[in-house]
Structures are given as C-alpha cells and as structure tokens.
Amino acid sequence: MNTATGFIVLLVLATVLGCIEAGESHVREDAMGRARRGACTPTGQPCPYNESCCSGSCQEQLNENGHTVKRCV
C-alpha cells in the first residue's frame, strides 16, 4: 500500500467514524431533552419555577437556616 492509498483509507475511516459519532450525539441530545422535559420536582424540594413541580404549585417557605426559599407543595 502506498502513501496515497493509505491516506485515502484513513480519510474514509475518519469520515465514517465522524458520521457515526455525530449520529450518536444527536440521539443522546434528544433523549436527554425528553428526560428533562418529562421530569418534575417532588414535594418539599426547592423549585425555581412553578411549572417544574409535580404538583404544579411552588410556595415560599423558611428553610432550616431561616432563609426564605421556594419549595414545591
């Protein structure tokens, strides 16, 4: 095998591996996105937004340090 043939083989291999990796990362991104959208915050846990609570309700409460935090109720 001469240098040109070796170079072409490596180029094809890199292209195939790049396409496979690009496809896998796209699938992982979709799966992670679906998991994030499907998850909700359980009761008693801090909630940055009302829509992230499983109950759909977020309320300000005092924590153990006396600070006001929003928690799912």
From Swiss-Prot:
Tissue distribution of the protein: Expressed by the venom gland.
Compartment list: Secreted
Originating organism: Atrax robustus
Residues of the signal peptide: 1-22
Swiss-Prot/TrEMBL keywords: Calcium channel impairing toxin, Cleavage on pair of basic residues, Disulfide bond, Ion channel impairing toxin, Knottin, Neurotoxin, Secreted, Signal, Toxin, Voltage-gated calcium channel impairing toxin, Voltage-gated sodium channel impairing toxin
Record carries keyword Secreted: yes
Disulfide feature: 40-54, 47-58, 53-72
More info: This toxin comes from a female specimen. It is observed that propeptide sequences coming from female specimen have only limited homology with the male paralogs, but the reason is unknown.
GO BP: any one term: defense response
GO molecular function, one term: toxin activity
Family of this protein: Belongs to the neurotoxin 08 (Shiva) family. 01 (omega toxin) subfamily.
Domain free text: The presence of a 'disulfide through disulfide knot' structurally defines this protein as a knottin.
Cleaved propeptide residues: 23-37
Lineage, top ranks: Eukaryota, Metazoa, Ecdysozoa, Arthropoda, Chelicerata
Name under which the protein is recorded: Omega-hexatoxin-Ar1b
GO cellular component: extracellular region
Purpose: Insecticidal toxin that reversibly and voltage-independently blocks both mid-low- (M-LVA) and high-voltage-activated (HVA) calcium channels (Cav) in cockroach DUM neurons. Also causes a modest block of insect sodium channel currents (Nav). Induces potent excitatory symptoms, followed by flaccid paralysis leading to death in house crickets.
Parts forming coiled coils: none
Domain of life: Eukaryota
Annotated site (Critical for insecticidal activity): 46, 63, 71
InterPro entries noted in UniProt: Omega-atracotox
